[in-house]
Amino acid sequence: MPKIKTVRGAAKRFKKTAGGGFKRKHANLRHILTKKSTKRKRHLRPKGMISKGDLGLVVACLPYA
């Protein structure tokens, strides 16, 4: 049986946690930041977690994570 390729884009975006979940970065924090409030930017800063509905897709993209 051949090895399964890891989706490299997913490998750069998601990191597996000890509990089996995946960390991800929030969107909307790259550019056009002047019109966004400090509170909004601050809440986007910490890492988020992948939702249960998307977990299967991420696991399929990262077979060895």
From Swiss-Prot:
Q: Which domain of life is it from?
A: Bacteria
A Gene Ontology cellular component where this protein is annotated is: cytosolic large ribosomal subunit
Keywords from the UniProt entry: Ribonucleoprotein, Ribosomal protein
- Tell me, what is an example of a GO biological process annotation in this record? translation
Query: PANTHER family from the entry?
Result: 54S RIBOSOMAL PROTEIN BL35M, LARGE RIBOSOMAL SUBUNIT PROTEIN BL35M
**Does this UniProt record's set of keywords contain Signal?**
no
Gene3D superfamilies (UniProt xref)? 4.10.410.60
Q: Which GO terms describe its molecular function?
A: structural constituent of ribosome
- Which family, according to UniProt? Belongs to the bacterial ribosomal protein bL35 family.
Q: Which InterPro entries match?
A: Ribosomal_bL35, Ribosomal_bL35-like, Ribosomal_bL35_CS, Ribosomal_bL35_sf
Protein name, UniProt field: Large ribosomal subunit protein bL35
Which Cys-Cys disulphide bridges does the record give?
none
Check the record and name the PROSITE patterns matching this protein.
RIBOSOMAL_L35 (PS00936)
